[in-house]
């Protein structure tokens, strides 16, 4: 009996250790060990990467976790694990989490990468998550930083999340994030890709301006018949200047909620795809160094509600406004903006028009004439409970409406104070009487758990986001220089010039 008790005394710690060890995960310290471990890891497994620089890491994860038992691959000490050189990550399994990695000092083969291809991190499987990672001026190869990409047999990843990541000083072409459900734009009128149901939240974007249509912060889908159903919320775009489109939303039924756009030289665009929602976003320009933007809207059946616009300068090339409503032909490449709700928004001291009802109209007329399409101006607009206010000596009236479009639309419960309206519509000048209107007929977006009617009826809530509210939990200071200075460092500026020159030559 004494022998058995003694044996049990030895075995018990060993059994405890065996049971606890899987919870602690495996710690890897080389590329080769990382590759081997991810081939063997099971659902619920944890792979921790030791501090260090992992040059030329080619991490391809094909194993899958399960609902409630994801496979997690993370930095042992977030911020002290660097993926550099000819790096790439492919998440081909499902229920995978990548956490706490810093992507920097890359040198991928320029010829091997291209815009609209897989990203530096390419997500091929569903239910995957990228969290608390940093992407800072990675290299000179044109690609997105993160993509959801179709598999070789055309399967579309769904229900993925990108959160609490920082994307700074990107000097290459293509968007920062591309969410794809087709391989290319489908323009024959047929239904595009299936719904994606992704979420991008609590991320930070700040990237320098590039020539042409070079790739903004986020693209969702390719064309108007794709179904997005993605939620983009609680992100901070601070000098996200890559191109004229901060976000290019090219699919249906996406929701943009609670984001902050600070000093961005572009607009948040409903570019293709009807029935999209923008609620409680903040569009702010607080200096006069550049022209800053709000929203540019194409398409129909949108909801634009409870957004706050305060722009110290506006974008001359687009028509100097906070909200642009596109004229043109219905359901075309430059689709007419019509049949939508614009409610409970605040336009405060916009150094431009609050709403431009016919931006770029001459260009749109030329396009319609060349393609034998009917040119129309925005109509069937329901403008309810909006506040227009100026107490600064800006020269613009509230509205730019060269065709008196406003007369074709519905105006209810709006208040305008401070300057001329610019159009002969009945809007109250009694600010004390202002209150948000109640909304009750907006249908929810499938797969997005937001009560749209309740959110809109509250009016604008909260305040603009700050760096501390979106940053990776382990990162105290903003990477790079562009966010705070609107300039790249000298060495990054030189690399940027080389990228632009190379792109022109090819």
UniProtKB/Swiss-Prot annotation:
The family assignment reads: Belongs to the polysaccharide lyase 8 family.
Q: Which InterPro entries match?
A: Pectin_lyas_fold, Pectin_lyase_fold/virulence, PL-6
Q: Subunit structure of this entry?
A: Monomer.
Q: Which Gene3D superfamilies match?
A: Single-stranded right-handed beta-helix, Pectin lyase-like (2.160.20.10)
Q: Where is the active site?
A: 250, 272, 333
One Pfam family, short name: Chondroitinas_B
Q: Top-level EC class, please?
A: lyase
E.C. no: 4.2.2.19
Record keywords? Glycoprotein, Lyase, Pyrrolidone carboxylic acid, Signal
User: What function does the entry list?
Assistant: Cleaves the glycosaminoglycan, dermatan sulfate.
Sites of Pyrrolidone carboxylic acid modification: 26
Give the organism, scientific name.
Answer: Pedobacter heparinus (strain ATCC 13125 / DSM 2366 / CIP 104194 / JCM 7457 / NBRC 12017 / NCIMB 9290 / NRRL B-14731 / HIM 762-3)
> Protein name, please?
Chondroitinase-B
